């Protein structure tokens, strides 16, 4: 789900080329909108149609279809195949109407796009979704009530800043031993450790009975909690987000069965619930979103999410039946009739948001084509690698092509290391016991570090916040980092693990806090519990 209008252009071109080479592709998503499924399938078939490879014979194609049916039948799954009248569009056939079932399998057959309804797993649940106030006091009060008898709650925030603020707030009230924080501003090695710990504590095999699952725990994080982690919360608090992401987040509530009728969960948390915050206040003409939330997601998409879920007031609530409601809810949010679901009083603000979103997406699509390879059809005509890329990268922007796949603001990745008594070291808790690297080990600067030390140092990488790189400051930031490395990094360029990497040296004060010298008007701090934080010089 790390894609947007910009990255989709790259994804479609990749699918087109994979189609041209007859390469099977599987895309898995619980919440992919119908229009995007169709868009991706058409991109694949566009390449398939323009391929120069020999098409399989009718007999072979029939054998493949029969094999598919036999494989499904062998699993004793009752499969419903929807094959209504096909609509021809530029050589590609597509079903006229997609089934409303969930799950649904979309697949290509020669030049046709087809859909197959697959029987659900059998487990379903109702999740009560409710709007709550965005204030600090409301968050503390809510969790204080919910965790009266214990339990494990997830708090998903849309920005790292909101997550760090919530974690500190909750740590101060409930105690830091009950609160864990995870987000993208942890060093790679710490982030992997955080996620491994969460899987151990909240995974399918951890229970209160076997001593693995905590009696009480609050996990605060960003979107990393909605992606790939097989963890299970007793209840969830989340910032508002586009509806497909809300559905992803709901999948972390009561993800695994905990006894008959969830009897192994605390009594107050046996009914699945999700509390949605991130709305600063409600105006007559629509919601005003909290600072930072509308910087991550388009206002129009957030309003559509609220409208589709019928959460249109400060005390609104609804019930979602999972997985049955996923397809319908996502389809409504991304369908052509979504405006009719938005309250009339919101229309002015919503229309403005739609216009801003459309302009932004059009710019993203146009920007993506600057460094997109040529289509299969064009290459079939020109047949020259020289023509594969249309743009020319000049010396002033020779790395733009490498950055182009993700439409993110330019930022810089650094290794966080510690300077102590004139030596460069790993951070105090960082080491590799398996390979004999002690915590806080010294990294040599007068010789090439051995591979074991260099690999650990390379895993101490993190991206600096966008704020440090804004307004064209990235060149001066890189220059300051290079100057800060001085001669310490000279021998590191001979290491395949460290060559070309920038380092930011932190210093430990009397209270064991790690922070940098001033860097382009900012001070960078890092801790094992909070990750990377930064303050402007005038804020110090």
Where are these regions (language model features)?
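Residues immediately C-terminal
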Residues: 1-5, 33, 162, 227, ...
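Short, flexible loop segments at the rims of nucleotide/cofactor-binding pockets, characterized by
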Residues: 2-5, 128-134, 214
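Conserved helicase ATPase motor motifs in RecA-like P-loop NTPase domains
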Residues: 2-6, 15-45
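Conserved interdomain linker/interface between the two RecA-like ATPase lobes of SF2 helicase motors
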Residues: 23, 27, 47-158
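Structural recognition of the conserved hydrophobic beta-strand(s) that form the central parallel beta-sheet
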Residues: 24-29, 217-222, 275
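Short, glycine/acidic-rich hinge or "gate" loops at secondary-structure transitions
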Residues: 30-38, 53-55, 264-266
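C-terminal helicase lobe and adjacent C-terminal extensions/tails of nucleic-acid helicase motors
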Residues: 37, 126, 130-133, 137-200, ...
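Conserved two-lobed SF2 helicase motor
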Residues: 209-226, 238
């Amino acid at each position: 789900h790390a894609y947007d209008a910009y990255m989709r252009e790259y994804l479609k071109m990749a699918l087109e080329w994979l189609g041209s080479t007859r390469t099977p592709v599987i895309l898995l998503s619980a919440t992919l909108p119908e229009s995007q499924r169709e868009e991706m399938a058409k991109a694949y078939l566009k390449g398939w149609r323009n391929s120069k490879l020999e098409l399989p014979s009718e007999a072979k194609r029939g054998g493949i279809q029969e094999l598919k049916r036999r494989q499904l039948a062998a699993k004793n799954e009752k499969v419903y195949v929807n094959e209504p009248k096909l609509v021809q569009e530029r050589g590609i056939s597509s079903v006229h109407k997609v089934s409303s079932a969930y799950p649904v399998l979309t697949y290509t057959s020669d030049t046709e796009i087809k859909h197959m309804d697959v029987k659900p797993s059998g487990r379903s649940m109702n999740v009560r979704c409710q709007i709550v106030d965005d204030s600090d006091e409301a968050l503390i009060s809510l969790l204080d009530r919910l965790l009266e008898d214990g339990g494990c709650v997830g708090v998903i925030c849309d920005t790292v800043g909101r997550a760090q603020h919530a974690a500190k707030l909750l740590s101060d009230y409930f105690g830091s031993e009950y609160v864990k924080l995870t987000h993208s501003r942890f060093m790679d090695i710490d982030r992997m450790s955080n996620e491994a710990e969460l899987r151990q504590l909240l995974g399918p095999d951890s229970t209160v009975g076997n001593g693995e699952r905590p009696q009480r725990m609050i996990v605060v994080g960003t979107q990393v909690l909605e992606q790939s982690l097989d963890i299970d919360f007793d209840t969830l608090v989340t910032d508002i987000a586009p509806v497909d992401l809300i559905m992803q987040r709901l999948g972390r509530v009561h993800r695994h069965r905990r006894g008959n009728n969830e009897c192994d969960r605390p009594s107050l948390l046996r009914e699945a619930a999700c509390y949605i915050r991130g709305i600063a206040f409600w105006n007559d003409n629509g919601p005003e979103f909290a600072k930072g939330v509308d910087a991550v997601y388009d206002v129009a998409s957030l309003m559509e999410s609220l409208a589709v879920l019928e959460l249109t007031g400060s005390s609104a609530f609804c019930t979602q039946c999972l997985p049955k409601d996923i397809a319908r809810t996502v389809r409504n949010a991304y369908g052509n009739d979504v405006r009719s679901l938005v309250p009339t009083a919101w229309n002015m603000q919503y229309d403005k948001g739609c216009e801003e979103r459309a302009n932004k997406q059009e710019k993203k699509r146009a920007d993506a084509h600057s460094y997109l390879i040529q289509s299969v059809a064009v290459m079939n005509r020109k047949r020259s690698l020289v023509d594969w890329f249309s743009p020319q990268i000049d010396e002033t922007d020779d790395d733009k092509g490498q950055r182009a796949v993700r439409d993110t603001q330019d930022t810089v990745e650094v290794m966080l290391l510690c300077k102590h008594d004139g030596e460069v070291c790993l951070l105090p808790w960082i080491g590799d016991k398996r390979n004999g690297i002690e915590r806080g080990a010294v990294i040599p600067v007068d010789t090439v570090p051995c591979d074991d030390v260099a690999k650990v140092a390379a895993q101490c990488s993190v991206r600096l916040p966008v704020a440090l790189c804004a307004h064209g400051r990235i060149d001066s930031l890189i220059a300051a980092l290079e100057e800060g490395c001085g001669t310490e990094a000279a021998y590191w360029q001979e290491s395949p693990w460290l060559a070309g990497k920038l380092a930011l040296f932190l210093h430990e004060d009397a209270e064991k806090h790690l922070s940098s010298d001033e860097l382009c008007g900012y001070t960078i701090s890092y801790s094992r519990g909070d990750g990377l934080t930064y303050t402007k010089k005038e804020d110090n």
